[in-house]
Amino acid sequence: SGTTKLFGLIGSPVSHSASPAMQNYGFQACGVDGAYLAFDIKEEEVPEFVKSMRLLNIQGCNVTMPNKTAAAQNMDELSPAAELIGAVNTIVNRDGKLYGHITDGEGFVANLKDHGIGVEGKDIVIFGAGGAATAIQVQCALDGAKSITIFNPRDPFFERAQKMVEKIKAKVPECQVELYDLDAKDTMREKIDAADILVKWNITWNETKRRYNSDLQIQQCFMKD
């Protein structure tokens, strides 16, 4: 219609994405006059696309690889987590001002709260240091976790995780953050025994995993005595 609001996904490639079908179904189910499209935008094209968002009044976008860092560099304002990580996966257009968010951590913490669990003052253990896991680490620290212990193999993510740990410490000095190799078995047992929250959560977004966990909700979550 003449008032249809436009939303989208930017990345490259995006032709395989299920996001348009999912989002447009949601618009229809909720009676929203909106349309969600996938835009194949390469990293070097992000600045021009951002200008187009203002020109065409695109209300918001999700951002996928390889554009998350470039998008963050072209925002008017970043959420605390996005600023710390230096990447965004969501852009919101409010009257021509673009706000960048990284929502993985926000969604994780919000879902815990929905299940009656808060992270403030808690000792947390996280396995993994990829993109989503990093966002979760950052959000838990920003939301008042007492300590965060990260275990990750010495893969390409490990060195990046070391740098992120130092950034979190500088931003949230009251939160104790440590990074260990997966081979540190004794430390792993010690930290798990001392942790306040044990969570088994599937944050993988692909067809195979959806067969086991179609809605990506918490599988097990409980407070330790």
Model-predicted regions and their roles:
Residues 2-115, 225:
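Phosphate/diphosphate ligand-binding glycine-rich loop within oxidoreductases
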Residues 6, 123, 146-147, 176:
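Residues at the starts of beta-strands that form the adenosine-phosphate
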Residues 11, 100-105, 120-145, 152-154:
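Glycine-rich adenosine-cofactor-binding loop
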Residues 31-39, 148-149, 173, 177:
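Short beta-strand elements in bilobed, periplasmic/extracellular small-molecule ligand-binding domains
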Residues 59, 146, 193-196:
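Conserved acidic residues
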Residues 107-112, 117-119, 131-138, 162, ...:
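Active-site glycine-rich loop that binds ribose-phosphate moieties when present
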Residues 143-172:
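NAD(P)-binding Rossmann-fold cofactor-contacting core
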Residues 174-225:
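Rossmann-like adenosine-cofactor binding region
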